[in-house]
Each structure stands twice: as C-alpha cells, then as structure tokens.
C-alpha cells in the first residue's frame, strides 16, 4: 500500500506484488496494512472495515461497540480477528484479541502486561506477531516499553525498556529494532537487539538530523530512513533508505528516497520510495546473490526521483515600451529546487542573474523582470539594453539527491529608439568628455532622471583624442541602425559623424568642411515631421539655419535652409524635442540676460513666436536637450552650473506656459567637468 498527498489530501493505492498493477483505494480515511498479508483496515469510530486485496472479496465491517463499551481501536490480524485496545470503564487498559465467530464477537485478553498499562500504539507485523508500545504506571521514567506479542498464544513474549522515547519499530524472528529519540533533539539512535536479550547487547547506530525515522529488518540487515525528501530545503543522508549489516560495519544505499516500508513475503520488504534510475514507486527489497540488500521496482508512480526539467513559459519578445515588466516561469519536478537563471545580452555580454521562486501552491519557478540590469542596488534602476538575450537555467536539488539540471533559451527586448541613447536601453545617456579626453556615456540610475556615476559603469565612446573637437553634439539617429549618433566639429571647421551601434560608436565619417562659420550647433530633434533627426546651426551673423536629416551616412543632411535672422541675441540654443504642444521638436534659447525662451516647432522646420520660460538661466554654463529621461512623453533639459560643476535636470511637463518642473540635481555632481553633452 502506498500513500500520496495532493493539496493536503491523502489518497491511498494498492499495488499487486505479482504484476505491479495499482488500484486506487476509496476514500481519504487512513488505511492500515497488516504486515506480510493483503489485509487493509480502515477505521471510522468503533467500526473497522477489512479489505482482503488478495482475494478481492467484498469488504467486511465489524463494529467493536457490539462487543462492549471501551473498544475504540483495532487493527486486523487476520480476515476475522483484530488486535484491539480496550479501555476498562473502571480505569486502565487491556490488550485484547477480538475474533468474529458464527455466534458473534469474542474477546481474549493478551497476558504479560502490568495492570493499568496505557497502550500507545499497536502495529501488526504479521498474522502471528504484533509490536506494542505501552507505558507502565509503576515506571516513573514514563518511557514507553516495547513488547512483542505472540498473537496465537495471546501473550507478550519479549519486553524491553528503551533509554528514550521510541518512534519507528520493527521485528523479525531473530531481532527487534527501534529508534530512540531524546526529547527536543534532532539526533536519533537506531537500536537493534537479538530477541531474548537486553538492550545492553544491542547494536546502536547514532544518527543526526533525524525526524520521523523508520526502521525495518531483513535477514541479517537493519534498514532505516526517513521521508520528506521531496519537500526538503536542505540535504540529509537519511532521506534515502540505508541498509546496515548486523554482522559487520557494512552500509549500503538501497533507495535514494524513502517514505515507508512494510514486510513482504519470503523475508523480503516492500518500500515506497525512489531511485535516480527508476524514479518513484514501490520497490521490493531483497537480498542479492552477494547477500546484500538491493531494490527491484515493482511499480512506478510516474514521478522522477532525480530533479527533472519539465517546461518553461518565457516570452519570445518583450516590448518594454508597452509593458513595464515581463513574467518568466519554469516548471521542474521539485518545487524546492534551488534555481538560478543567467540572462545574457548577446551584443554586449552583460549578464543578469535572477533567482526565480515558487508562489503559493504553484510548482512553477516564477520571476517578474522589471527590465533593469539588476534586482539589487546599486544598479536597480538602469534599464537593460534592447536586443537578443540568451537565458540559462541551473536548478540544483535542495535535498541533494541527484545532479543539477540545466536548460537554455532565448528572448528579445525591444523599445522604440530615443534620442541621446548610446547603449540602446530606451533612456537617454549623459555624454561626458573626461579629463583624459576620452568620451563616455553615463546611464541614469533611476528612470526619473537621478544619476549616480559611482555606481554605473559608463559606456566608452572613444579613448582619448576628443580634445581635437571644439563642438560635440549628441543627437538622435541620423543614419544607419536605429541608434543615437554623435556629431563633432574639429578646430579646422570639419564636421564629422560618428554612428551609434548600441554599444559604442563606429569610425567617424566626414560630413563636410566650412562649419567654423557657426558658433552654435544643436540637434537631437525631428523638426520637420519626417521622423529623421535634423540639425540647427546659428552663424556668427545671427542667422539660424536648418539642416534637414536625410538618413544617409555619406550625406546625412540636405542643403541648408534659412530659419530666420537675429538669433545672435542668444548665447545658447538647444533642440530639445517635444516639450509642449504638437509632436514636432521644440527649441529653447537663452538670451544674454539669462532669460530662457521656448519656440514651439510647427513640424515644417519653422517655429511659433517665442514664449518666455523664465530668467536666471545665466547661472548655467550651458543648457542642452537631453531626450525624455523619465519616459513620460515630454523632452527634458539639462542645465550645467559652472561653479561648482553641478548638472541639473528639468523635466518636461507638456505645458507651454510652464514647460519644465523645478530642477532636480544629478548625484555625484563633482565627478563631472563642464564637458557634458
């Protein structure tokens, strides 16, 4: 007989020894098997129902209350007999053999027990033998005695007093075994003694991490182990079934997992458990040709013993513009497995480490990814880059039984391209020319515009040599792949294009010469409504020119067109994208008195009349567009204070009259020089 649990409800099944066929038993009330027989007893109140699974005959119910009051328990020792405990109404208990006869029920007292004994358990080893635990009221230790009952003689024939409370017990014609467990202890001792001797002559096997240990006896060997392997959070050698020789110190592992065992015919045992090779089920334990116990599967219940990968639910494409997070799940044969998933961005090699976990009663390992590079500070807010990812799952059995399992797969992250984004993760980057004249891009630590460059690894855009340029303009996508590009003008007036790759910049391509006539350059916005990034250039005479983007790397701009004159009153221009009004890119301009003005783009390369934003902007060395750092649909602005070198973010509001919020400082500001773009 085997027992299974599903959602806290037990079910029972009977497996035929001969052919391994399994029959589900009715009801969820416990069944008790009579050792070395096909008899099962199921109790409800004082009624005991016996099923003979060998003959398949109809169940026979016996109500012990018809005999006399006080019969509250009983286990079949044969088709028509029970070993029962009778509670004397005047006090004390007696062990009785109750037999069903043609004239009714007959009770016979089992002799050899002290008056007033308190019987705590009765186990039927065979139709001939029972194991009984009882407490002697005269014994001040209150430790249960262990007695072997000869059912045919109606007498106790062996009686021992263990040193501590006992749990598992077993008996054979030659030996008696039990488990001693001191109070409040996780240690236990398996004790085996020849029958007719005393515990002083016993073999004692001390064990650690024991809980609910069971024992069994087979010719010349004691077997022990405990259940719970599939629910375990840690390793324990006792989860398997171990056989220890009674004649020497040999020990062998018989099963990798173990739940319970009952005596079988011919000196064998039947055990519920599993092996890595055969999986979970019912096993016959018998001596091999070498005299060592071995397991032979009788029936499988279909469950693997080894940790097994079952399935996954992983999205193929994750659109982080539409969804702020993505759900992943993996199903394994054991929900307690220690699971780690490493997701690697193919283009950069950047690896994310996830620890999926089970939730509620689900057996799936689940993980909800927020699209960030890490679950843990300091990088919890840095979005992961777009593109192809591989994932690799490693699951290790928490119970230590069997090898780890591995599984790999892929998924893709996508977002729409945004200006000022050089690492292709959907948010703008802050480009910085460092003191060694290298160029790097810093990513925001949170999606709200706060930065901390101490904690984020900047993306290298070029090592050294950037001092040859007197103008650097961070733009949107001008040509080639949909990544932000960069313009740089050298001191001879030649303009160069660096195309972005999502993980750096390509080699420069010459746009053309003569650009020294301009003292202000700004880009990163679509001013003409064709979804291409355009460039504004103001010459030293105060004329503002539009260079419309073409999308071609060899000729990224069309011939210039005049926007207007008198722009010389401004010492700072910034094409910022959509700040307010229609979707077209807008322009902010700071005059020499420090007043900042807003020009709303019309979408044709021209602008509305200016609107005053406010004064005091002379506090900044320069002001430039930064894209939409908080991803609310409105462009944001950076102002860089000169003393000290302190950058501030102004977040766009979408309102023409108040286009920006109050400023928000960037963290770790002392790190920056004035060379920010």
Map each language-model feature to its residues:
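Solvent-exposed loop/turn segments flanking beta-strands in beta-repeat/beta-sandwich domains
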Residues: 332-351
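Solvent-exposed serine/threonine-rich low-complexity stretches and specific carbohydrate-binding patches
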Residues: 110-113, 161-162, 207, 256-257, ...
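Surface-exposed loop/turn elements that mediate protein-protein interactions on large endomembrane-trafficking
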Residues: 1-28, 43-68, 88-114, 137-161, ...
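Eukaryotic tandem repeat interaction scaffolds
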Residues: 128-235, 528, 537-625
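Hydrophobic multi-pass inner-membrane translocation pores used for secretion
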Residues: 160-172, 178-180, 205-230, 239, ...
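Repeated scaffold domains used in trafficking and secretory/extracellular systems
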Residues: 24-37, 65-80, 114-127, 162-174, ...
């Amino acid at each position: 007989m085997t027992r299974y649990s599903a959602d806290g409800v037990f079910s029972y099944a009977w497996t035929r020894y001969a052919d391994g066929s399994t029959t589900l038993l009715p009801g969820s009330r416990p069944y008790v098997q009579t050792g070395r027989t096909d008899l099962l007893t199921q109790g409800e109140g004082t009624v005991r129902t016996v099923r003979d699974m060998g003959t398949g005959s109809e169940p026979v119910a016996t109500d012990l209350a018809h005999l006399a009051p006080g019969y509250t328990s009983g286990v079949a020792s044969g088709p028509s007999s029970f070993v029962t405990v009778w509670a004397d109404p005047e006090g004390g208990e007696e062990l009785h053999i109750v037999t069903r006869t043609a004239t009714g029920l007959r009770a016979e007292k089992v002799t050899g027990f002290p008056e007033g004994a308190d019987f705590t358990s009765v186990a039927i080893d065979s139709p001939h033998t029972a194991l009984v635990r009882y407490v002697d009221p005269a014994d001040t230790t209150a430790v249960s005695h262990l007695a072997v009952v000869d059912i045919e003689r109606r007498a106790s024939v062996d009686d021992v007093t263990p040193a501590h409370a006992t749990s598992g017990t077993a008996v054979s014609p030659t030996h008696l075994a039990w488990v001693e467990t001191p109070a409040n202890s996780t240690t236990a001792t398996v004790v085996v003694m020849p029958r007719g001797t005393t515990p002083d002559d016993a073999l004692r096997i001390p064990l650690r991490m024991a809980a609910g240990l069971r024992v069994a006896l087979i010719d010349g060997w004691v077997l022990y182990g405990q259940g719970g392997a599939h629910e375990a959070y840690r390793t324990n050698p006792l989860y398997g079934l171990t056989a220890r020789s009674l004649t020497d110190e040999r020990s062998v592992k018989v099963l990798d997992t173990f739940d319970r065992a009952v005596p079988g015919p011919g000196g064998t045992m039947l055990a519920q458990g599993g092996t890595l090779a055969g999986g979970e089920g019912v096993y016959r334990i018998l001596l091999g040709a070498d005299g060592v116990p071995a397991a032979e599967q009788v029936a499988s219940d279909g469950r693997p013993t080894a940790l097994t990968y079952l399935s996954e639910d992983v999205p193929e494409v994750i659109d982080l513009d539409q969804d702020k997070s993505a759900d992943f799940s993996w199903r394994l044969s054991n929900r307690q497995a220690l699971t780690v998933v490493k997701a690697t961005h193919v283009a950069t090699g950047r690896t994310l480490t996830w620890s999926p976990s089970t939730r509620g009663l689900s057996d799936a390992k689940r993980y909800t990814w927020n699209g960030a590079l890490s679950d843990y500070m300091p990088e919890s807010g840095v979005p992961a880059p777009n593109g192809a990812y591989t994932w690799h799952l490693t699951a290790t059995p928490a119970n230590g039984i069997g090898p780890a399992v591995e599984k790999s797969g892929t998924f893709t992250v996508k977002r729409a391209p945004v200006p000022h984004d050089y690492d292709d993760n959907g948010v703008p980057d802050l480009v910085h020319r460092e003191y060694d004249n290298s160029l790097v891009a810093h990513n925001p630590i949170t999606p709200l515009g706060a930065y901390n460059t101490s904690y984020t690894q900047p993306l290298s855009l070029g090592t050294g040599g950037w001092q040859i340029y007197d103008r650097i303009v961070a733009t949107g996508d001008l040509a080639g792949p949909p990544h932000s590009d960069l313009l740089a003008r050298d001191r001879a007036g030649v303009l160069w294009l660096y195309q972005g790759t999502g993980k750096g910049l390509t080699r420069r391509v010459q746009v053309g010469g003569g650009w020294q006539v301009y003292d202000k350059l700004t880009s990163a916005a679509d001013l003409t409504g064709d979804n291409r990034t355009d460039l504004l250039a103001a010459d030293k005479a105060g004329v503002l020119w539009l260079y419309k983007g073409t999308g071609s790397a060899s000729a990224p701009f069309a011939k210039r067109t005049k926007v207007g004159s008198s722009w010389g009153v401004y010492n700072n221009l910034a094409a910022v994208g959509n700040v307010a009004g229609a979707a077209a890119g807008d322009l902010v301009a700071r005059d020499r008195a420090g007043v900042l003005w807003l020009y709303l783009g019309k979408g044709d390369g021209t602008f509305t009349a200016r609107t005053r934003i406010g004064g005091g902007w002379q506090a900044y060395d320069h002001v430039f567009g930064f894209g939409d750092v908080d991803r609310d649909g409105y462009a944001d602005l950076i102002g860089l204070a000169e003393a000290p070198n302190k950058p501030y973010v102004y977040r766009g509001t979408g309102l023409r009259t108040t286009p920006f919020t109050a400023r928000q400082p960037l963290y770790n500001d002392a790190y920056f020089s004035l060379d920010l773009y």
